[in-house]
Amino acid sequence: MNQRIAATALLGVAEQAGLDVLTLAENLDRDELLRSRLTREEVRRQLRAIADALSALHPELRRAMPEIDWSGWEHLRSALAATAGDALDEALWFAVESLTPALLLWLRIHRRSQPELFAMRG
């Protein structure tokens, strides 16, 4: 698969999963999210999809969007591998409250300012 098409697809996966995370967590406070087993697991699954997609992006593409917290997403990717515990809870909530909204904001900005990064062309 062409690298440009793959990158566009990965960005699309990250964006859609981010929207899903925000929809799932909408109107939930931290304790509600962490108590809701089904919602919590689906949020975790979507966050893993985002982190995996972002991790697979070529370094050149990452450099084109320096505002995205790449190291934060890598850290989250590692944290999501934990089975349970306070560190996982903190990582989930931080991703819902901070990482995901910031990612979606920057993707929207870059889609406008650098549309070629999001073009599905070979």
Where are these regions (language model features)?
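Solvent-exposed interaction patches of small proteins and small membrane subunits
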Residues: 1-122
